[in-house]
Regions:
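A structural signal for hydrophobic residues in beta-strands of small regulatory alpha/beta folds
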Residues: 53-54
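C-terminal alpha-helix plus adjacent terminal tail
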Residues: 36-43, 57-209
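CoA-thioester-processing core
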Residues: 1-33, 45-47, 60-77
Length: 209
């Protein structure tokens, strides 16, 4: 779970900005929305954003949870580590394991079937009214901001989004997927025109072949 957001020239309007404050504590909602960090499904389950995580790797008949995520302990040195990404050698071992691991969605299918069977045994009219009643809180803010958000997104495509999207799309050429944010802020603070020279100064340069 994560946002492309401000790191790549966008803002998750009509999505995360609407529902995250309802689904996470405010400070966590703010940080998840603006930091563009990736948070694991296990971390999101622990925080209450999702209701279930199931393993999809089957190793010789044994179900294995995501090996890149800490799931075998909750606390380390006084900090909650459950759901955090492994680092260093542990992360490398996890990536190597996943390359040859067998993917099996049996447990996921089972959980989906449980949800469907639960819904099947409910009055359909009451079910949809209940679902819409929960979603109404998000939709209220979506309706309040959808017009101004649309106009802002159109303008943004000619500025920060243009830079961010191009930086991301040319990663194979430049070796980097983001602009030079320090140079961008420096030129902006000096009041320089947003022109071709400005854009060339902050975008990555083609790597030498």
């Amino acid at each position: 779970f994560g946002q492309a957001g401000p790191r790549h020239g966008s803002a998750p309007d009509g999505g995360s900005t609407d529902f995250l404050p309802w689904m996470l504590p405010m400070e966590l909602a703010m940080w998840n929305c603006v930091s563009c960090e990736m948070w694991s499904a296990y971390k999101m389950k622990q925080l209450g954003l999702i209701s279930k995580c199931v393993p999809v790797i089957n190793d010789k008949g044994k179900w294995v949870r995501n090996p890149a995520i800490i799931t075998d302990k909750y606390i380390e040195d006084g900090e909650i580590v459950y759901g955090e990404f492994k680092i260093g050698e542990d992360a490398k071992k996890a990536r190597d394991f996943v390359k040859s691991a067998k993917t099996d969605f049996e447990l996921l299918d089972t959980e989906v079937n449980k949800i469907l069977w639960t819904y099947t045994n409910l009055f359909p009219g009451c079910l949809i009214k209940s679902v819409e009643g929960i979603r109404m809180k998000k939709k209220f803010f979506w309706d309040q901001g959808k017009t101004v958000n649309r106009h802002w997104l159109a303008v943004n495509m000619n500025c920060e989004a243009y830079l961010g999207f191009n930086a991301f799309n040319t990663k194979k050429i430049t070796g980097q997927d983001v602009i030079d944010f320090i140079e961008y802020r420096r030129r902006q603070a000096q009041g320089e025109a947003f022109d071709l020279e400005f854009m060339a100064a902050v975008l990555g340069k083609p790597q030498k072949s």
